[in-house]
């Protein structure tokens, strides 16, 4: 009877370890998505800064989608349209758009840090469970 309880406990610990490892994998993938989004936002920010400084009168190709672009000329580089969520677009200056981007980057960095802390916490729990599991294993006979 005691052996059954020990086996069940071992299985419970193994299930808990698998659960934590699955969560860690998911959280790491979310950190990757956040990193890609931050990279994209930083690229947009740098592009806005460049266009504000040197964009007036420049001819550019405007992407339409599916690898198709159209030639256009920048008349007022300080007039941008920005998505504020739920498909709502508003006019903004480059400075306003860049400020919005910086706020989004900061929020994403805060979320990234929280996810990394959770990964660290879950990893610590897995290590504790592995130690507990190792202590429960019978000594190997030679």
From Swiss-Prot:
Q: Name one GO cellular component term.
A: prefoldin complex
Pfam families, per this entry? Prefoldin
Q: Does the keyword Transport apply?
A: no
Coiled-coil regions listed in the entry: none
Is-annotated flag, keyword Cytoplasm?
yes
Record field: transmembrane:
none
GO MF, one example = unfolded protein binding
Task: Enumerate the subcellular locations listed in this protein's record, separating them with semicolons.
Answer: Cytoplasm
- In Gene Ontology terms, what is a biological process of this protein? protein folding
What SUPFAM superfamilies does the annotation carry? Prefoldin (SSF46579)
Similarity field: Belongs to the prefoldin subunit alpha family.
What is the recorded function of this protein according to its Swiss-Prot or TrEMBL entry? Molecular chaperone capable of stabilizing a range of proteins. Seems to fulfill an ATP-independent, HSP70-like function in archaeal de novo protein folding.
Summary of subunit composition and partner proteins: Heterohexamer of two alpha and four beta subunits.
Instruction: Provide the protein name.
Output: Prefoldin subunit alpha 2
Q: Which organism is it from?
A: Thermococcus kodakarensis (strain ATCC BAA-918 / JCM 12380 / KOD1)
